[in-house]
Amino acid sequence: MKDEFGREIRSFRLSITPECNLKCFYCHREGRTEENGKLMSPDEIGKIVSASLEFGVRKIKISGGEPLVRKDLPKIIQNIKNDQIKDISLTTNGILLEKCAEDLKKAGLNRVNVSLDTLNPKKYKEITGGDVEKVKRGIEKAIFLGLTPLKVNFLAMDITLNDLSEVMDYCKKVGAILQIIEFIPVDPNLKHHHIDITPIEEEIAKKSEKVVTRKFMQNRKKYILDGLEIEFVRPMDNTEFCGHCTRIRLTYDGFLKPCLLRDDNLVDVVTPLRNEESIRSYFIKCIKNREPFCKAE
């Protein structure tokens, strides 16, 4: 199904918990500003995903909070798994990944994205409160088990820019894809950390041996530089990002969310599900609510 702007729905991002085992100062909390809802059960999540298939969803991304803090995550993945789903991936901070990777692989997870803004232990602890060595071990365990292609999410900010070269070298060494992500300063007090990543992309484009445009990923370009795959994610003021968005979202407490950058047009889908109603009409409402946050002039 297409929305009123001609955009197909292909991807469904599931936030399964607001809880996290780190305290990153920049966290946008998947666009949610409240934490007062009840978590969905694995069965409820499975039913909602199953209902989404009719509307074109073929890829699932699991996020949080930190999804690995849910001990029933393997069960959630098992309930999501379906012959029509082509890809189940997960975004994690990586702290618990070494411990959980094998069970997630067995449950049916295909691949992971891991946040890594610096390899400097002191700076990592200052930014997140965590231990970067645990993250590295998790990344390497996941790659060993075949949870690939593994992507490293590097958040480009004023305080992490000097770490980019080292993170690039690490990704090349372990065989990870690098995603350089523009920082979204949801809190106005953090705006000074935002940097324009256009010059970084232009410099990498000049040096790259190959450039591929990904049609179903907001026309995002993939650069090949010395064997390393590099992608850029620029959601701010980006008409390409919004104009080609194929994703809807589900909040941890059961609301369909048409847009990452909006919190005023959510559609409650878990209440009718719990009342044993059909939830088809709620997906239709969500898709009709979709519009590009950034529109071309």
Swiss-Prot record:
Keyword vocabulary terms for this entry: 4Fe-4S, GTP-binding, Iron, Iron-sulfur, Lyase, Metal-binding, Molybdenum cofactor biosynthesis, Nucleotide-binding, S-adenosyl-L-methionine
Cofactor annotation remark: Binds 2 [4Fe-4S] clusters. Binds 1 [4Fe-4S] cluster coordinated with 3 cysteines and an exchangeable S-adenosyl-L-methionine and 1 [4Fe-4S] cluster coordinated with 3 cysteines and the GTP-derived substrate.
Ligand binding ([4Fe-4S] cluster 2): C242, C245, C259
Keyword Aminoacyl-tRNA synthetase: no
Residues that coordinate or bind GTP: R13, K61, T91, K151, R247, I248, R249
Entries under Gene3D superfamilies matching the protein: Aldolase class I (3.20.20.70)
GO molecular function: 4 iron, 4 sulfur cluster binding; cyclic pyranopterin monophosphate synthase activity; GTP 3',8'-cyclase activity; GTP binding; metal ion binding; S-adenosyl-L-methionine binding
Sequence ranges assigned to domain Radical SAM core in this UniProt record: 4-220
Cofactor: [4Fe-4S] cluster
Binding site for [4Fe-4S] cluster 1: C20, C24, C27
Pathway in which this enzyme or protein is active: Cofactor biosynthesis; molybdopterin biosynthesis
NCBIfam families named among the record's database cross-references: moaA_archaeal (TIGR02668), PRK00164.2-1 (NF001199)
Purpose: Catalyzes the cyclization of GTP to (8S)-3',8-cyclo-7,8-dihydroguanosine 5'-triphosphate.
Protein name: Probable GTP 3',8-cyclase
Gene of this entry: moaA
